[in-house]
Curated annotation (Swiss-Prot):
The gene is alcR. Residues 75-93 have a biased composition (Low complexity). This is Regulatory protein alcR. Induction: By ethanol, threonine and acetaldehyde. Expression is autoregulated and subject to carbon catabolite repression. Positive regulatory protein for the ethanol regulon, alcA and aldA. It control positively its own expression and possibly in a negative fashion the expression of the gene coding for ADH-II.
Length: 821
């Protein structure tokens, strides 16, 4: 009887990938004795035939001691080997740093890790995704270099040693892809499991669970290669463990960067649209502690699951899978930015093959996420919105021709950066959802009866339509749930904050205008009961504005709320003096959280000035806008600048999370001040104002450039004194983020802009000081400029833009020094 199995199952990997007929011999034992084990295609194209590897494994098996062939013996052998391998994985040892148990990246990784990220979607469960996997395209870009990622797997991991040659990407997909598709529940479970103990990336229990999973050994029942089933099962276990560990590492990086920053930037206390702006909920206080969660990502997924009526329809099964895939790939692309090299320092010297392999991984992850987001542009989903926001913060890999074509000047690099497009897409969708949510709230409020004396009560007896009392309207889950309402408010405020910063940096128009970003109320304007409408002359009623209507988001709202801190016991705000270090941890966290919207307000004022300048506003309007902007700047200088200076002076004494928060916040603030100086210079140059601001421009630029250089110096101080010393941030953060505090920054381009702008300003000052006799001042300026360049070199490990700008600045600084000497 003829063999009914598919001929493709008899083919080697290269022939199956190339869809060629494989003429490998059927009697492989005889062929091995005759020395013919490769098919003609592999011989012709000089490929490594799979049957070469199989023959070598069979030869090793013949030389080993004979084993029993009974089913019981095979089962015992199969189950004992994974347990032995699991025992070789080191158990995390407790130390004074409580560091995550991640191995050093310089340990040699097994050969089977090659190409593991050739298709980034394999890190998650996308076996039946609506978006094509493009596995064959991914196979063409596979690199032969060793995989440089820190997988938390020791180099002598015995499960992978049996493979002398790596499998092709197609074979990797067959091993790595599980039999089910992603959904919101899987994502939430994955996020919650990852954040149960942020200090752990992997543990031996997870390995034992993988080893005991009976599904891993299903290959033993396959009719193909029964004598090598043990090897294939062990390889499957190793790959599955590597995939799980890779996922945990990437999720850990996302957690330690994005969610860490959002726990400070985005709270119910500093969100103007939140119902709980007067106090900080206990859950948010816990988010400031050492064990924070993936709060926003989890809440966005939960909101998306119950927002059917808000979007107007339910998502189809394919749309749900596409949304989950887009969010997963956005997180993968975001986390893939951070280098995994063991070498430390700004002058990183990485072998060319490893550097090329890592760049290929980053490029593939970025392209996969971009394609997934392009396929989901028409899907009304909060997961897609959040994925666009995350991806807009992700730096792409620049090709060599792109680097030479755009040059290294910061303005050219920003002009060609396409990241704002994804952020604008997210903000337009958020704005649409907010409009729908406001309508739903008004419909819910409409069921309440108006007070006596109103139009409704006057005509109640004439136009009233009876309704069954038993059919009481049901509130929508989003409207009824305080958590979902708060999540929607936080999402909208997150989009507004990023839109404001992006518009100021890239000099692009705002997606959501000042009027559309005001606080909206579902309740109609209150009308006094004693003032009914005069039906004779239709005199409009007097309206009593609510507290929210008195609050202008871009007025002095944040300046008033920042003067008080939340009192958690009475759920009120109490007046507090400006925070100074040393202080309690919670006081420091609350001060930084309250300062965040003030920073956003300055960016908004800068954007308003840019808009007025573009529209050709009158000198009086421009001057009034300038004074409003300077009022915000002076408020920060009096309220928060002393605390920031304390943090810079005591950087190494600060808790790790306070370090990460203040460095990012201070860098953002000084960039806004330098952008303000640019706008004022444009106003003076074009003679749009009757007042000359040249002295103010000079002071703003120099003061803030020096402040940025001091920020870089404080962050780099530990590396200068002891390059091998572990950073205090090593206690709570993934080791890819711990070398210097500003590596935690999720929005890399903002700090690139800040450090680069400060360095360019200091370079210009070198021309002025170099003409004088103040040698000490010249040397100090040169040193400060060098601090900014070194900070950019560190950021260049995850951003080509930073590396290019650092090289350009270094050439400029060397030229200035040569001319001075």
């Amino acid at each position: 009887m003829a063999d009914t199995r598919r001929r493709q199952n008899h083919s080697c990997d290269p022939c199956r990938k190339g869809k060629r007929r494989c003429d490998a011999p059927e009697n492989r034992n005889e062929a091995n004795e005759n020395g013919w084990v490769s098919c003609s295609n592999c011989k012709r194209w000089n490929k490594d035939c799979t049957f070469n590897w199989l023959s070598s494994q069979r030869s090793k098996a013949k030389g080993a001691a004979p084993r029993a062939r009974t089913k019981k013996a095979r089962t015992a052998t199969t189950t004992s080997e994974p347990s032995t391998s699991a025992a070789t994985i080191p158990t995390p040892e407790s130390d004074n740093h409580d560091a995550p148990p991640v191995i050093n990246s310089h340990d040699a990784l097994p050969s089977w890790t090659q190409g593991l990220l050739s298709h980034p979607g394999d890190l998650f469960d996308f076996s039946h995704s609506a978006i094509p996997a493009n596995a064959e395209d991914a196979a063409n870009v596979q690199s032969d270099a060793p995989f440089p990622w820190d997988l938390a797997i020791p180099g002598d991991f015995s499960m992978g040693q049996q493979l002398e040659k790596p499998l092709s990407p197609l074979s990797f997909q067959a091993v790595l892809l599980p039999p089910h598709s992603p959904n919101t529940d899987d994502l939430i479970r994955e996020l919650e499991e990852q954040t149960t103990d942020p200090d752990s990336v992997t543990d031996t229990n997870s390995v034992q669970q993988v080893a005991q999973d009976g599904s891993l050994w299903s290959d033993r029942q396959s009719p193909l290669l029964p004598e090598n089933s043990l090897c294939m099962a062990s390889d499957s276990t190793a790959r599955r463990y590597a995939r799980s560990t890779m996922t945990k590492n990437l999720m850990r990086i996302y957690h330690d960067s994005m969610e860490n920053a959002l726990s400070c930037w985005l709270t119910e206390h500093n969100c103007p649209y939140s119902d709980q702006i007067s106090y900080l909920p206990p859950k948010q206080r816990a988010e400031w502690g050492p064990n924070w969660s993936n709060r926003m990502c989890i809440r966005v997924c939960r909101l998306d699951r119950v927002s059917t009526s808000l979007r107007g329809r339910a998502l189809s099964a394919e749309e749900d899978k596409a949304a989950a895939r887009a969010l997963h790939l956005a997180i993968v692309a975001f986390a893939s930015q951070w280098t995994q090299h063991a070498q430390r320092g700004a002058g990183l010297n990485v072998p060319a093959d490893i550097a090329a392999d890592e760049r290929s991984i980053r490029r593939n992850a970025w392209n996969e996420a971009r394609h997934a987001l392009q396929h989901t542009t028409g899907i009304p989903s909060f997961r897609v919105i959040f994925a666009n926001i995350i991806f807009s913060l992700t730096q792409s890999v620049l090709d060599d021709d792109e680097q030479h074509g755009m040059g290294a000047r910061l303005d050219k690099l920003l002009e060609n950066d396409g990241a704002p497009v994804f952020l604008e897409t997210a903000n337009r969708q958020l704005y649409t959802f907010r409009h729908k949510f406001a309508r739903m709230q008004r419909r819910g409020k409409a069921f309440n009866r108006l007070p006596g004396g109103s139009v409704a009560s006057t005509f109640a007896g004439i136009f009233e339509t009876p309704t069954p009392s038993s059919e009481s309207p049901q509130l929508d889950p989003v409207v009824a749930s305080e958590e979902h309402r708060s999540t929607l408010s936080l999402m909208f405020w997150l989009g507004i904050m990023f839109d404001t910063l992006s518009a100021a940096m890239y000099q692009r128009p705002l997606v959501v205008s000042d009027e559309d970003s005001q606080i909206s109320s579902a309740s109609p304007p209150r009308r006094g009961a004693e003032t009914p409408i005069n039906l004779d002359c239709w005199e409009p009623p007097r309206q009593v504005p609510s507290n929210q209507e008195k609050s202008d988001v871009w007025g002095d709202l944040f300046l008033r709320t920042s003067d008080s801190l939340p009192d958690h016991e009475s759920h009120t705000q109490i007046s507090q003096p400006a925070a100074r270090w040393p202080c309690t941890y919670e006081q420091a966290a609350a001060a930084l959280s309250s300062a965040t919207p003030v920073k956003v307000l300055l960016y908004r004022r800068v954007t308003q000035l840019q808009t007025l300048l573009y529209r050709g506003a009158s000198p009086a309007r421009l001057e009034a806008a300038i004074q409003r902007t300077l009022y915000v700047y002076n408020h920060w200088t009096a309220k928060y600048q002393p605390f920031m200076q304390d943090c810079v002076a005591n950087h190494e004494l600060l808790p790790s999370r306070i370090q990460s928060w203040y460095v990012i916040l201070d860098g953002h603030w000084h960039l806004a001040a330098m952008l303000l100086a640019d706008v004022l210079e444009s106003i003076d140059r074009d003679s749009y104002s009757d007042i000359n601001h040249i002295d103010l421009v000079t002071k703003l630029r120099l003061d803030n450039a020096l402040a940025v250089s001091a920020l870089a110096r404080s962050s780099l101080r530990g590396q200068e004194l002891d390059p091998g010393k572990a950073s205090p941030m090593y206690r709570h953060f993934h080791d890819s983020l711990t070398e210097v505090a500003f590596l935690v920054e999720p929005w890399t381009v903002v700090l690139i802009h800040s450090f680069a702008k400060a360095a360019y300003i200091l370079l210009d000052c070198l021309d002025l000081d170099g003409q004088g006799n103040a040698l000490a001042g010249y040397l100090q300026l040169r040193q400060n400029c060098n601090y900014c360049i070194r900070a950019l070199q560190f950021l260049g490990r995850k951003s080509d833009m930073a590396a290019l700008v650092a090289k350009d600045l270094e050439r400029g600084l060397n030229g200035k020094v040569d001319s001075f000497l």
